[in-house]
Amino acid sequence: MTQQNAQSTSEPTISENDLIAQRHAKLKQIQDVAKETGKSPWPNTFKREHYAADLQEQFKDQSKEQIESAEHVYVKVAGRVMLNRGSFMVIQDMTGRIQLYVDRKGLPKDTLETIKGLDLGDIIAAEGYIGRSGKGDLYVHLEGFELLTKSLRPLPDKFHGLNDTEVKYRKRYLDLIVNEETRKTFEIRAKVVAGIRAFLTNERFMEVETPMMHVIPGGASARPFETHHNALDMPLFLRIAPELYLKRLVVGGFERVFEINRNFRNEGVSTRHNPEFTMIEFYQAYADYKDLMALTENMLEKLAIDILGTTDVPYQGEVFSFKGPFKKISMFDAILENNPQFTPENVGDREFLAKFVREELKEEVKPGFGLGKLQTIVFEETVETKLRQPTFITEYPAETSPLARRNDDNPHITDRFEFFIGGRELANGFSELNDPIDQAERFQAQVAEKDAGDDEAMHYDAEFVEALEYGLPPTAGEGIGIDRLVMLFADAPSIRDVILFPHMRRKEG
């Protein structure tokens, strides 16, 4: 057969606009019938009593013969039509899928005609009794049926699915309908959040809520989003971190607090960064950073077991062990371990590191950059991506840790850690700075850096310093990125895969 003949005998392709027009025509028929009978074309009186997954679980051990020989079990289900073959359909609800058997001899003619005219994506209610096919599939033997919602747009072709990444992000509702893996990802996300909440609540932490709009951006080094309060005629900033408010609560006597909420940072978008993201921050009085490292080990190990059933977490071709204790190493030693060309003297030499950053890393060295800032740059550029298995990096420079407590033995470093896995930072924690005089001086140093051109340096927060002057007990605090943690448990390559509605560039037109 020639190419021309093959094309001439192929099925004509129906455009999406034509399919939409056909569905609108069907809706018009439904509306006309509803008008004649006095019923609503969008009924809302059906009450579902059963879910697909529950029925699959309930009858999983019963054979076709056992089900047929027993008394009929009647059920009421509802869901979206994912397959319609005339004699049987498949509907999908929030828990999974189940078949509906259409008995042509036992149903009225008008019901059969309605079923025949169903489109994929329509939402229906069904009543009947449980059965099992010769192939072993559980089904509902249809005795009652109602169209609840007419779908006016066709679902993606079942053979090609929804594979366009941008469409998946922009139309997440469509992605959730047709892609089971996407639904599983967000079920994992819900379990992660619930698991963290339960773990901390069990440890006597109290969940709180703090402001999302701040008069002064603080709590982290980042560029904020700015807005304006019309009634008060004043600028406000979407929060970059809740830290300074949570520590005020510890001053007030809430000795163990946590908050799960959004932070906003007016920075770049990548596979690891979204301008709006979810964090868990928690603070514990009468504890230090070592206590929080232990708590983090216990919490992550429990999450892995509860969600995945194992402490071996597969991620993008690697396997990460969430079985504690995790590796712990200072930033200074991590730089040496991953840069064999360096000596301890090199890592402690500002001029040497400044030259290395300029000439080897090709990054600008501003006049205000001290030794600690340069060490941090070298660490971020030469070490971070090599930290594959769970690792705590400790002893961060005081220069880049304006809210952390100085180490008692070495005032140039702080009692701080960052937690890395798969080459990515997942958590940041430290013994809190509770010396109001030292805090004021560090805020002043940050202001000087901001004046020198560092957009991410912190502002001076006089109200927070005043709160510290009333007395903050010895305290440790930590923040964990929920989105990045979900990426690990869901084996998702991009942060956009674990955020229901990630930020996208506005479409032209």
UniProtKB/Swiss-Prot annotation:
The main enzyme category here is: ligase
The cofactors named for this UniProt entry are:
Mg(2+)
- Family annotation (InterPro entries): Aa-tRNA-synt_II, aa-tRNA-synth_II, aa-tRNA-synth_II/BPL/LPL, Lys-tRNA-ligase_II, Lys-tRNA-ligase_II_N, Lys-tRNA-synth_II_C, NA-bd_OB-fold, NA-bd_OB_tRNA
State where the protein is found.
Cytoplasm
Q: Where does this protein hold Mg(2+) 1? A: E418, E425
| Entry-linked Gene3D superfamilies | Bira Bifunctional Protein, Domain 2, Nucleic acid-binding proteins
Q: What is this protein called?
A: Lysine--tRNA ligase
Organism whose genome encodes this protein: Acinetobacter baumannii (strain ATCC 17978 / DSM 105126 / CIP 53.77 / LMG 1025 / NCDC KC755 / 5377)
A single GO BP annotation from the record? Answer: lysyl-tRNA aminoacylation
Paste the cofactor note. Answer: Binds 3 Mg(2+) ions per subunit.
| One CC-aspect GO term | cytosol
Q: Per the record's keyword annotation, is Signal included, yes or no?
A: no
